[in-house]
């Protein structure tokens, strides 16, 4: 299949592109390039790509593709709070516009990278895809809005699937240090402490970036009649853990001491997720990597590739990177690339 992969120079896209290529797909990327040089270790080999702001994509850019995998977004809650209106502009309006243009261009399948954050404050019970949604951040709200708008676009000729990823972890050449496991491991190696700013009680489902990539690859080739219009949680119940439990895993792999301060106050985002629909609809997608696997992988990568405090707190933190691009006049207040 000919695949357009948006966000191919991001954390997930850099892992996903080679997985898709190994499965025999012809991959073209689309990325604005904010994080292209945010690399730890050897530079990845990117697929051919279009350097375009998501808000400026045209139908002509999408012609000839069999499927679009849409990863590109302002990718976490702190970025959403930085500029909520821009979060909605990019994550919601531009994403739905992309889907409409893809349908207009004759693309048959649209895989949307959603999030388990749509469940928000769900408590201790397992939540499945038909649960009431309770997003608590602009990032999560934007994802819910896109899912609803995709429902209106879905028909016999345009198969949309919203894949609700658990919180990602694991090494990517274009690393992120602002997601929970990656952050805790890095801080532990740099300081000797596993620092948890919440009280440690919120539940989080975690999933390795490579497992996410394999799920998307499976969704590409699944029967359209089986997956059309579906919302599918991406992860495994084995990785439903509290933040304190994640910290204990990191301590075991690094030898660092756990320190739970609670200074950030109560985090309303807490949810345990049911992944049985994934196993039923995409049985070939084997989510298999544990949190301990990811912690060991990250420890080795951080040590082998020379992680430093400056890299950890700036290059690989999305909010810090956006601010750096703005302060150096490479992007403007609307997050558009400066001429």
Describe each region flagged by the PLM.
Residues 197-339:
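C-terminal substrate-binding subdomain of Rossmann-fold SDR/epimerase-dehydratase oxidoreductases
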Residues 142:
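Active-site helix of classical SDR
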Residues 1-67:
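N-terminal Rossmann/SDR dinucleotide-binding element
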Residues 54-90:
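NAD(P)H-binding glycine-rich loop region in Rossmannoid oxidoreductase-like domains
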Residues 6, 30, 68-71, 110-116, ...:
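SDR active-site strand-loop-helix element
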Residues 39-41, 78-85, 121-125, 173-174:
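Conserved catalytic-core motifs of eukaryotic protein kinase domains, centered on the activation segment
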Residues 148-204, 209-218, 249-250:
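NAD(P)-dependent short-chain dehydrogenase/reductase
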Residues 96-138:
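Conserved Rossmann-fold NAD(P)-dependent oxidoreductase catalytic core, especially the SDR/UDP-sugar
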